[in-house]
């Protein structure tokens, strides 16, 4: 008999690819806000998983059909198991997941968002520790949310571009930024 998953395994074995934000129509479709840079995760038929909280064991669903809402980071998905609006509404705020083993390969200089969270941030010029990466925002330009050691109640947003973030060393859990005037204010 298989051992039950530990809390850590429940979280580490999965990648959150989106959040169900609304029901769509009357046939059980849902709207999903993407947390992935890979549209195929929402357009390709196959197995996906959902859970309400990271402490829950993910439940499987079969993606039957998916399409992107033009100009938005939203997808409309239809799952075989969800057949009416009431079932779809019950899934609002659930996380949509794939196994961590399904990570797609990246080009050099590309990173999975989950790998950036928790990295220790250092000043590129003098090596001083500045804080920790606590969030990631996809906007016009990607932004790192950094909680500073000197002011842990404040998050600063730093553009995630090579000119400002020249060094990312995942194995060392290290990220370096070039501090320019006003960047960390």
UniProtKB/Swiss-Prot annotation:
Membrane-spanning segments: none
Record carries keyword rRNA processing: yes
GO biological process entries: maturation of SSU-rRNA
GO molecular function terms attached to this record: ribosome binding
GO cellular component, one term: ribosome
Keywords: Chaperone, Cytoplasm, Ribosome biogenesis, rRNA processing
All residue ranges annotated as the PRC barrel domain in the record: 108-183
Pfam families, A to Z: PRC, RimM
Localization per record: Cytoplasm
Subunit: Binds ribosomal protein uS19.
Domain-related comment: The PRC barrel domain binds ribosomal protein uS19.
Similarity annotation: Belongs to the RimM family.
PANTHER family: RIBOSOME MATURATION FACTOR RIMM
HAMAP family: Ribosome_mat_RimM
Known role: An accessory protein needed during the final step in the assembly of 30S ribosomal subunit, possibly for assembly of the head region. Essential for efficient processing of 16S rRNA. May be needed both before and after RbfA during the maturation of 16S rRNA. It has affinity for free ribosomal 30S subunits but not for 70S ribosomes.
Name under which the protein is recorded: Ribosome maturation factor RimM
Species for this entry: Synechocystis sp. (strain ATCC 27184 / PCC 6803 / Kazusa)
